[in-house]
């Protein structure tokens, strides 16, 4: 739930394990 993945997901996907896309950034649940 916290935006600590340091990754963006403008394309709709996150590469960081345990992270999901909350456009336009990846968040960790």
UniProtKB/Swiss-Prot annotation:
Keywords: Disulfide bond, Knottin, Plant defense. Pfam families: Cyclotide. Disulfide bonds join 5-19, 9-21, 14-26. This is a cyclic peptide. One of its GO terms (biological process) is defense response. It comes from the Eukaryota. There is a cross-link at residues 1-29 (Cyclopeptide (Gly-Asn)). InterPro entries: Cyclotide, Cyclotide_moebius_CS, Cyclotide_sf. Belongs to the cyclotide family. Moebius subfamily. The presence of a 'disulfide through disulfide knot' structurally defines this protein as a knottin. Probably participates in a plant defense mechanism. Has cytotoxic activity against a variety of drug-resistant and drug-sensitive human tumor cell lines, and against primary chronic lymphocytic leukemia cells. Has weak cytotoxic activity against primary ovarian carcinoma cells or normal lymphocytes. This is Varv peptide A. It comes from Viola arvensis. The lineage of its organism: Eukaryota, Viridiplantae, Streptophyta, Embryophyta, Tracheophyta.
